[in-house]
Amino acid sequence: MREIIHLSTGQCGNQIGAAFWETICGEHGLDNNGTYVGNNELQKSKLDVYFNEATSGKYVPRAVLVDLEPGTIDNVKTSQIGNLFRPDNFIFGQSSAGNVWAKGHYTEGAELVDSVLDVVRREAEGCDSLQGFQITHSLGGGTGSGMGTLLISKIREEFPDTMMATFSVVPSPKVSDTVIEPYNATLSVHQLVENSDETFCIDNEALYNICQNTLKLPQPSYAELNNLVSSVMSGVTTSLRYPGQLNSDLRKLAVNLVPFPRLHFFMVGYAPLTSMGSKSFRSVTVPELTQQMFDAKNMMAASDPRNGRYLTVAAFFRGKVSVKEVDDEMHKIQTRNSSYFVDWIPNNVQTAVCSVPPKDLDMSATFIGNSTSIQELFKRVGDQFSAMFRRKAFLHWYTSEGMDEMEFTEAESNMNDLVSEYQQYQEASIDEEELEYADEIPLEDAAME
């Protein structure tokens, strides 16, 4: 089977990762020890994508948990799902990266990276046909961003033919832990543009807004934010974990969503999102799900899709839904809002339906959009980066770890290039595309036509 190896790096990555494993164990009928207690054959049919069956009959996640300090990993070990994971797959240092990207990427992280790669190799050897890796991390800290991107590039070297998907939490000014987040994020994006195949951008600010405005939680805790992320991750990976035709592995997902290799940063959305109080007062319908999942307020990245255009979209509906109704609704959305979809990629909205609903819900929908408006997110980080870098503020934290200012300049210009590429394709239209092709036809061919 086509296996996926999961890596959690840093505090944020491990917390999201733990929430993800808890969610999918519940969906696949596994208890906290990895024993199958479900009653639906569909739950077992593609279990080996994420789980390894041990001789004892228990299912063990193909997960490697990495951090430069022991705190978060200890919390995962002692949590209710702590017994799921293979004890050798917890790898942690004692020092911490202190929120500095350079420590995670060049010094502290580089010392730990070989022992992580040993575990990754061992996991890969236990696979029949490895399709790729998924990594959860944040871009604002030191370990998830610095060591996370180091791991991505090392795994890229060693497994060049496999896919690399990342769930990356982008820092936002409203929910900020440290002042140097823009540096860490820009240096990370510089790496992700080159080394990741698909990056799902999740943004703390957007998560807070959803919790406060839609779920009516006045003071959302990290656990509640992580639950949101884990429902999205569970939705995004539905087609990988259950039998189906569309986007059934990471590569097919990328083929449908990535028109140009550098533009692989996706926005994700999820429905139904309802506050606890009003849950019992509404029934969820397909039109309502479609409406809500395309709603800008429910995007998990703080950029507004109405300010850009969708290059491609993938939607996953789960539960007892009629395929025809789903297709009709999606078609309606496209025809009513045709100006928000680029016209030079035909059939750029793909829809998949899976009959197994998430736990405790009748139906749900997950949305992945490759929208040019994601540039807002990079612009925001870029502006903060430039403001500090112009004055060389806090640079000594990085140069003292052996980094060069040149790297900062390169990262900045790579991110600016990314923004202008998105802008270029936002403005492109069919006529321009045809003109470009016309330029490429040699004159004698043109004359023959």
From Swiss-Prot:
Its predominant location is cytoplasm
Membrane spanning segments where? none
Q: Does the keyword Nucleotide-binding apply?
A: yes
What keywords are annotated for this sequence in UniProt? Cytoplasm, Cytoskeleton, GTP-binding, Magnesium, Metal-binding, Microtubule, Nucleotide-binding
Q: Where in the cell is it found?
A: Cytoplasm, Cytoskeleton
Binding of Mg(2+) occurs at E69
What Gene Ontology cellular component terms go with this record? cytoplasm; microtubule; tubulin complex
GO term, biological process aspect, one = positive regulation of intracellular protein transport
Q: Does the keyword Nucleotide-binding apply?
A: yes
User: Which GO molecular function annotation, any one, does this entry have?
Assistant: GTP binding
- Check the record and name the PROSITE patterns matching this protein: TUBULIN, TUBULIN_B_AUTOREG
Which prosthetic group or cofactor does it need?
Answer: Mg(2+)
The residues listed in the UniProt record as binding GTP, with positions renumbered to this chain, are Q11, E69, S138, G142, T143, G144, N204, N226
Indicate the quaternary assembly: Dimer of alpha and beta chains. A typical microtubule is a hollow water-filled tube with an outer diameter of 25 nm and an inner diameter of 15 nM. Alpha-beta heterodimers associate head-to-tail to form protofilaments running lengthwise along the microtubule wall with the beta-tubulin subunit facing the microtubule plus end conferring a structural polarity. Microtubules usually have 13 protofilaments but different protofilament numbers can be found in some organisms and specialized cells.
Q: Function, please? A: Tubulin is the major constituent of microtubules, a cylinder consisting of laterally associated linear protofilaments composed of alpha- and beta-tubulin heterodimers. Microtubules grow by the addition of GTP-tubulin dimers to the microtubule end, where a stabilizing cap forms. Below the cap, tubulin dimers are in GDP-bound state, owing to GTPase activity of alpha-tubulin.
Protein family (similarity comment): Belongs to the tubulin family.
Q: What is this protein called?
A: Tubulin beta chain
Q: What is the lineage of its organism?
A: Eukaryota, Fungi, Dikarya, Ascomycota, Saccharomycotina
Q: Which gene encodes it?
A: TUB2
